A protein has these predicted regions:
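N-lobe entry segment of adenylate-forming
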Residues: 1-57, 61-74, 148
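Conserved S/T- and glycine-rich ATP-binding loop of Class I adenylate-forming
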Residues: 84, 101, 132, 185
Length: 185
């Protein structure tokens, strides 16, 4: 990055001499979001949601909330490499879960709220989904799908589902199980 900034007005040199870093380990949520953005710009606005569900979060708030969610997900059995189907609109939990999953080394399968039960069955089967996070209103779309999948609802959790708000009760600091290899999914 510094090389590109220093050569931003000299395109031939920037193009010829730039080399991507060859990292052995890298975790965006831990190594960039928390270590750089939250630490150095914690009070600055990181997220602004307008319209229904209007909300704002700073880098520090998202960092801590994602730590809590990561700890809560870990307590529910989410492990490195497992897949989480995430079906939420543009709401704060979407961003908290994205960062939390990265911290855990879990793989997020994003899903639009427009998917039908048939579409979701396909995602479950091909994606090898182990965990699911969706709104309580969308919970009926998952009826009849793999009952062993951990189900977490944003809103009033139906029977058999965990409540997302309980994840936010996790510890405010997070320690990863180990390093994330730069080649990990």
């Amino acid at each position: 990055r510094d090389f590109l900034f220093a050569n931003r007005s000299n395109y031939p040199v920037a193009h010829r001499d730039f080399r991507w870093p060859d990292l052995e380990h890298f975790n965006y949520a831990l190594d960039w979001f928390d270590a750089e953005l939250a630490r150095n710009h914690g009070s600055q606005l990181a997220l602004k949601i307008t319209g229904a569900g209007e909300a704002e979060r700073t880098f520090a708030q998202l960092s801590e909330a994602s730590n809590r969610v990561a700890n809560g997900l870990r307590a529910l059995g989410v492990k490195r490499g497992e897949r989480i189907l995430l079906m939420l609109g543009n709401v704060v939990p979407l961003w908290e879960v994205m960062l939390a999953a990265m911290k855990l080394g879990a793989v997020v399968i994003p899903a639009t709220t427009l998917l039908t039960p048939t579409d979701l069955k396909d995602r479950f089967d091909r994606g090898r989904v182990r965990h699911l996070i969706a709104t309580a209103a969308d919970a009926p779309k998952f009826d009849g799908l793999d009952p062993t999948v951990t189900r977490i609802a944003v809103g009033d959790a139906p029977a058999g589902w965990h409540n997302y708000d309980d994840l936010l009760k996790g510890a405010p600091s997070f320690t990863p199980d180990g390093p994330t290899r730069a080649t990990d999914p």
